[in-house]
């Protein structure tokens, strides 16, 4: 299987008024195509910091003190915000733990998926809706 994500020795800290706070220490894991990965742990254990670092969504007071995040062989940590925007939602995505911030409950899920597809693939609304339906069927959502 092809390795799509490799997190190596990741260490992240935050600058605070009280000084530097270490959020995660020496986090490493691999994710292969077709696998599903769940990151679990106690509140405050660094799950969100780890996943936000993969998406390039760390707060401005965050410091990556060590490590690499390789997505398809390219280090995410070395990409500019503009480069990250091109891959977020198209090549890599994150489901946030608070579902109310992930999907709009007043809008059909197919339409929300279609909007993302249209934005990243520059396709028509009709094609976006068709592809969204296909993707939802693949994951068992009728």
Please describe what each predicted stretch is.
Residues 1-142:
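ABC transporter nucleotide-binding domains
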């Amino acid at each position: 299987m092809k390795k799509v994500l490799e997190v190596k020795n990741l260490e992240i800290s935050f600058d605070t008024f009280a000084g530097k706070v270490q959020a995660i220490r020496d986090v490493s894991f691999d994710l292969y195509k077709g696998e599903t990965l769940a990151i679990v742990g106690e509140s405050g254990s660094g799950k969100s910091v780890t996943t936000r670092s993969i998406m390039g969504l760390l707060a401005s007071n965050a410091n990556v003190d060590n490590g690499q995040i390789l997505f398809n062989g390219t280090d995410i940590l070395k990409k500019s915000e503009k480069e990250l925007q091109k891959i977020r939602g198209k090549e890599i995505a994150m489901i946030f733990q608070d579902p109310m911030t992930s999907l709009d409950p007043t809008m059909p899920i197919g339409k929300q998926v279609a909007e993302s597809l249209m934005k990243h693939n520059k396709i028509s609304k009709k094609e976006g809706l068709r592809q969204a339906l296909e993707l939802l069927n693949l994951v068992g959502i009728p």
